[in-house]
Amino acid sequence: MVQSKAKAGFQAGVKDYRLTYYTPDYTPKDTDLLACFRVTPQPGVPPEEAGAAVAAESSTGTWTTVWTDGLTDLDRYKGRCYDIEPVPNEDNQYFCFVAYPLDLFEEGSVTNILTSIVGNVFGFKALRALRLEDIRFPVALLKTFQGPPHGITVERDKLNKYGRPLLGCTIKPKLGLSAKNYGRAVYECLRGGLDFTKDDENINSQPFMRWRDRFLFVQEAIEKSQAETNEIKGHYLNVTAGTLEEMMKRAEFAKEIKTPIIMHDYLTGGFTANTTLARWCRDNGVLLHIHRAMHAVIDRQKNHGIHFRVLAKCLRMSGGDHLHSGTVVGKLEGERGITMGFVDLMREDYVEEDRARGIFFTQDWASMPGVMPVASGGIHVWHMPALVEIFGDDSCLQFGGGTLGHPWGNAPGATANRVALEACIQARNEGRSLAREGNEVIREAARWSPELAAACELWKEIKFEFEAMDTL
C-alpha cells in the first residue's frame, strides 16, 4: 500500500529547494535545534534559495527528488529556513535561520550534531561562502549530555581557592626540554605563587621527552611545591595521543600518580575522544583542561567556517572544566564584546540573546555545569588589571612568556604575577576602578615587590595593537 502510494505521488526531476525548505511562516518549537548561518550566495542565487539549500543539505534533502521521499514524513524530519536577514554593512551576505527537528540528532553525541549540520553543506557550489554563527541547543537535547566533568564550583572546592581568578603558566620552550628540566621549570613556577602550570598543546610524547617521564617529574614538582607553599597545585598533563586507547592509558597513569588535572586538545583529538575522556574524568575525580588548538583554522574567517561561540558551546556539552577563550588584550584574536559573549555561554546557566555580543539565540543550559575560561597568549603583568576587570573571578589567567621571560627567572616571574593579581583583587574589593586606576595599582604594588618591579620595567613597552577580525 505504501509502495503504490509513493509511486502514484512521485515526480522525478530537480526543483528549487525553496519550494520545500523555505518556510517563513514556521514558528520554531522549544524542542527544535536552531542554527544561524551567515550565507554568501553565488551571483544570481536568491537568498531564499541559498537559505533553503542550507536547510535541505544539512537535513533531509539532496540535489534531486528521490523516490524514497514518499516512504517517510518529510514535514516531520526536514530542516526549515524560517527567517532571512541581510547582514548589516555587507553586500550579498545574509543571516539564514534554520530549525532542525530534535529527532534528527543522536542523543549525547556532539559528533553527530556537527556531522549533520556542517558535515556536507559547506562545499555546496551554490554558496560562495558559509559560516555557522550560532546554535540554540534545546533543553531536551542538552539533558542527554553529561557536560563538564566537574564545573567551576566543584573545582574551587577541590582547590580550596576562592575570590580571585586562578593563575597559570605554559612551560616554555614548548618543545625540546628533557623531562627533568621540564619538571624543574614546573616546580619553580608553582613555588613562586602560581596555581597551575601547563603542557603546551603539542607536547605529547616526543623522543626528547616521553610522556611517562614527564608525568613523573611533574608530579614530583607538584608535591614539592605544595609542601613548601601549603597550597594545592596542579599541572595540566596533556594526555592527547594518536589513539583513544593510548589516551586513556595516559589518563589512567595520571590518576595513579594522583595528579589533580589532565589536558586534552579537543579539536585535533576529536569530539568522540573528548566526550569519552570527560566522562572518565567525572567518574575518577580528575579535572579536565581543554586546549583549542586548530580553532583559528575553523573560526578565523569572518564569512566562512564555524564561529568559536559554537565550538565553545559544543565543548561545554562534550565536557571540559577549562577552555582557552582568548584574552582581548594579548597577542591572540579576540574583540571584547564578542569574546565576553562566548565566555558567558561557557560559564553562565542562562544567556539572553544579545546581537551586540554575537549571541543570536537565548540559551538555557538547564543546570549544566559551567566551563572556566582561560585567558592565555601574549599577556604580562601590565595586563593584569584589564584581565581581572574583563574576566572576573571565575577565570584562569595564564602567563607563559609573561612568567618564564622574567629577567630573574621562573620563580620571580611567578611571584610578580601573583603579587600583581593579589594587588588588583584587593584594589577591586576596596572599590577602586581597575579600568581607570589599573596601572597605578600595579605601580603601587611594585614599590614593595622587587620581582614585580623588574617585570614592569621589562614589559612596559610591549603591546599587541592590531584590529580584531572577529567583529559583527
Curated annotation (Swiss-Prot):
It comes from the Bacteria. The keyword Magnesium applies. Transmembrane segments: none annotated. SUPFAM superfamilies: RuBisCo, C-terminal domain, RuBisCO, large subunit, small (N-terminal) domain. Substrate binds at N120, T170, K174, R292, H324, S376. Binds 1 Mg(2+) ion per subunit. The modification N6-carboxylysine is found at K198. The active site is at K172 (proton acceptor), H291 (proton acceptor). It catalyses: 2 (2R)-3-phosphoglycerate + 2 H(+) = D-ribulose 1,5-bisphosphate + CO2 + H2O; D-ribulose 1,5-bisphosphate + O2 = 2-phosphoglycolate + (2R)-3-phosphoglycerate + 2 H(+). Its EC number is 4.1.1.39. RuBisCO catalyzes two reactions: the carboxylation of D-ribulose 1,5-bisphosphate, the primary event in carbon dioxide fixation, as well as the oxidative fragmentation of the pentose substrate in the photorespiration process. Both reactions occur simultaneously and in competition at the same active site. Heterohexadecamer of 8 large chains and 8 small chains. Belongs to the RuBisCO large chain family. Type I subfamily. The basic functional RuBisCO is composed of a large chain homodimer in a 'head-to-tail' conformation. In form I RuBisCO this homodimer is arranged in a barrel-like tetramer with the small subunits forming a tetrameric 'cap' on each end of the 'barrel'. This is Ribulose bisphosphate carboxylase large chain. It comes from Gloeothece citriformis (strain PCC 7424) (Cyanothece sp. (strain PCC 7424)). The gene is cbbL.
